[in-house]
Swiss-Prot record:
The lineage of its organism: Archaea, Methanobacteriati, Methanobacteriota, Stenosarchaea group, Methanomicrobia. This is O-phosphoserine--tRNA(Cys) ligase. The keyword Ligase applies. The keyword DNA-binding does not apply. PROSITE patterns: AA_TRNA_LIGASE_II. GO terms for molecular function: ATP binding; phosphoserine-tRNA(Cys) ligase activity; tRNA binding.
Amino acid sequence: MKFDPEKIKRDAKENFDLTWNEGKKLVRTPTLNERYPRTILKYGKAHPVYDTIQKLREAYLRMGFEEMMNPLIVDDKEVHKQFGSEALAVLDRCFYLAGLPRPNVGISDERTAEVKEILGDIGNDGVEKIRQVLHSYKKGKIEGDDLVPEISTVLGVSDALVADMIDKVFPEFKELVPQASTKTLRSHMTSGWFISLGALLERQEPPFHFFSVDRCFRREQQEDASRLMTYYSASCVIMDEGVTVDHGKAVSEGLLSQFGFEKFLFRPDEKRSKYYIPDTQTEVFAFHPKLVGSNSKYSDGWIEIATFGIYSPTALAQYDIPCPVMNLGLGVERLAMILHDAPDIRSLTYPQIPQYTEWEMSDGELAKQVFVDKVPETSEGLAIAASIVSQCELHGEEPSPCEFPSWEGEICGRKVKVSVIEPEENTKLCGPAAFNEVVAYQGDIMGIPNTKKWQKAFENHSARAGIRFIEAFAAQAAREIEEAALSGATEHIVRIRIAKVPSEVNLRIGSIAQRYVTGKKKKIDMRGPVFTSVKAEFV
């Protein structure tokens, strides 16, 4: 709360200790539903794949490479130029781009009548305008998503009517079948490097050191724990007259060492792709301590992480490139799986999709899903709730029957006297579960006493909901007293006995937590004998 510094200085000069102690009155008391852990400061989190991409970009830049964006859409003739006799095998793994053809639509007398029936009397001039727009669409002068707005504009009718007219009068648009083009989505970054380097030589001279971290597409038979149909490749090239295989080894070590890899092993790749010079295509195996003992086939710490080679002159010559080029590439997702301890590439990439990811909520997240249902809406109501809790804390062990005044004043325009009571004999003001606190522990949400038995559960403050049964009940009692004051009642009594479910102690569990707890076969346990009552007497 805001305060007057000058007043504080004056008061402190007169009585420092009193002013210091009263400082706590200037700090607003949060409502039950505002208490930590429900009051949080959220922060953004990078996706693990994009986080790894950024780290790779920074690593390449530190090594002196310049970033380049390569063509993503590649004509299949480029693949033939680059891969030679292997082109068909490569293209079998490529996605071809297809598009809908643009039909040649005629407007007969019958269709003219249908158009006028839907759009109204637009006259022969209106029909001619439609014919001209459709002709322009066929010629490619108007894009498909502009067709309806264009007709709407020239005729001065609504988009909805035009869309309805096209749907009913011109069925050709609904019968269109996509036609494949010769354009493909690149399956290797190599497809783009040849095009980029060939074009660059017209304006610059080597040596070149470039890198690109971007998306590739591969038509896999199916996606599984280790492969996706779309992935990110972190690729680099060095174009220099003196480039050798050793440059590939040096780049491998320089790049991967920045990610915690410690030892390297280079083996000839058995694939022998035709776009590499024979015997230069090399697999890079690297040792990472995080893999040691992992529940994977890489538990010895070694993993195949990258491939490099020297581009073949037979492929480079197709682009008039006269200089040797070393190319290295690695899959970003595989590196991200290591850095983020992910066992499945699908769950790493798409954690939001249930079929790929085991749902896990921490105890702290579950605790944030616990709320008090009915809460007072006035400052007087909040004061009543606080006074009820205070009296229960002071006199909870008092034998019954007993009654303790807790608050007196005006609420909602009426004077009221509030007391905590227990009319029954041979018991206490509060039952043994009154001061149970709501805690999330090992996936369960429970109302438990803060005793030695539950010490482990209470050690994690972020998993404590910050709500005791008596506080939730007091909030309900205060809210009902507000409502009773407005209704004109002369007396109102609120009782709680043995709680069996959250609602009986005025608690509400968020639907997400309920689904999680049920799905995990965990429990929500808010049972216990609370046994107390609150009486409000209106004057």
